[in-house]
Amino acid sequence: MRKGNEIELLVEGIEFPAKGFGFVDGLKVYAKNTFPGQKVFGRVTKKRKEYAEIRVSEVREKASYEEDQKCPHFGVCGGCSSQTIPYEKQLELKVEQVKDLFKEAEVPTGEFLGIETSPIQWEYRNKMEYTFGDEEKGGELTLGMHMKGKSFGIVNVDKCVLVDEDFRNILDTTVKYFREKGLPFYKIMPRTGYLRYLVVRKSVKTEEILVNLVTTTQIDFDLTEFTELIKGLNLKGKLKSIIHTESDALSEAVIPEKVNILYGDDFITENLLGLNFKISPFSFFQTNSLGAEKLYSIVRDFMGAADNKVVFDLYCGTGTIGQIAAGKASKVIGIELIEEAAMAANENAKLNGLNNCNFIAGDVAEVIKTVKDKPDIIILDPPRSGVHPKALDYVIKFNAPQIIYVSCNPKTLVTDLKVLETKGYEIEKTLLMDMFPNTPHVETVVKLNKK
């Protein structure tokens, strides 16, 4: 077997995140987003002594348990990977992958409590970031998601089933309008064009909708007609905000260099477990609101009785976990790298009448050195890269009786848990939460106690 060869592979097992594997001539071969029982065909993209990887071009045989796809974009759009897998099987595979990581790292799970299901499997997302582009080079304007296995192709996802019909309506109306106007989309190379992204957010409890059109400054285009068009849509939810963000940044991330409010406010409000949270166009907020309520309830339950206790909420984002914990604690201190998020956290705490919370902007690894309070409980909710080693050192030095680790990446989770174990922490229990049905992702919540 050599790089560039095309081979057929029977998928026999799976490793996180949904990397199926089988064996060809005794060599372990990985195929991303495949599942046990499938027979796939693809090209070898990497060949090592111990393993190889292929990019799948065709699923030649489905697994016996697979169902028909629900979405017409499945297989072309890169958004979903497990839509044909029955939900109970998705959960089973996620549990298997996470438990295998713990076993491989020789980290105990403590009492393993299984996996909590998402309250809804479809139309659960409260945010979508759509990209302007074309499906084929030189083709008509499209607005949607990156095509599976391609660097530049964008597929229209006007029938996506991860969002409700308001998202689909806004997307369809927007792309048709800008096709009619003949405006060019932004091309990464040679960095020319106007239309970049359309970001839509919708809160579940209040049903408020925010629409954010992101463009470059290369064309001076009057968006009054577009604004009136969106305002005139027959939406189930309540249109609260239309924003125009101007960004000439080289980064593919939405970087707001100038923000213009075309209609309404610059935020929407979501309610979680009785608390209100203002969400700006750029706020980090869990994309499954109903799932977030379950996730944060798990954290609150893991805390147990927290009266008269000081809680640290590290990597706190807009302070959702910290504020939900505040009802049980005497004091909450949150640390968040992004200044805008920390400011929003303090604003939300004030909005909710919580005077026992303080959210600080800065790098966790640096700010944590300056905090004088001694925590009874530390809540860790780091990015996919895990807790920075310097920050983890300070977490350990605080010698908190209890740590609750909320992880979106079980690979970095087990690495950090191994360190905490060597420093005198014992894992009491582990529970998974499926926040992202039909995708490989899963949240893991672990409670640790100081021996």
From Swiss-Prot:
Organism from which the protein derives: Clostridium perfringens (strain 13 / Type A)
Which InterPro entries does the protein's record reference? MeTrfase_TrmA_AS (IPR030390), NA-bd_OB-fold (IPR012340), SAM-dependent_MTases_sf (IPR029063), TRAM_dom (IPR002792), U5_MeTrfase_fam (IPR010280)
Occurrences of domain TRAM (ranges): 1-58
Name the SUPFAM superfamilies for this protein: Nucleic acid-binding proteins, S-adenosyl-L-methionine-dependent methyltransferases
Q: Which GO terms describe its molecular function?
A: 4 iron, 4 sulfur cluster binding; metal ion binding; rRNA (uridine-C5-)-methyltransferase activity
Look up the record and give one Gene Ontology term from the biological process aspect: rRNA base methylation
Instruction: Summarize where [4Fe-4S] cluster binds, as residue positions.
Output: 71, 77, 80, 160
Which residue positions are annotated as catalytic? 408 (nucleophile)
Recorded E.C. number(s)?
2.1.1.-
Entry protein name: Uncharacterized RNA methyltransferase CPE2114
Q: What UniProt keywords are attached to this protein's entry?
A: 4Fe-4S, Iron, Iron-sulfur, Metal-binding, Methyltransferase, S-adenosyl-L-methionine, Transferase
Family of the protein in this entry: Belongs to the class I-like SAM-binding methyltransferase superfamily. RNA M5U methyltransferase family.
Q: EC top class, in one word?
A: transferase
- Please tell me where S-adenosyl-L-methionine binds in this chain: 286, 315, 336, 381
Pfam families, alphabetically?
Answer: tRNA_U5-meth_tr
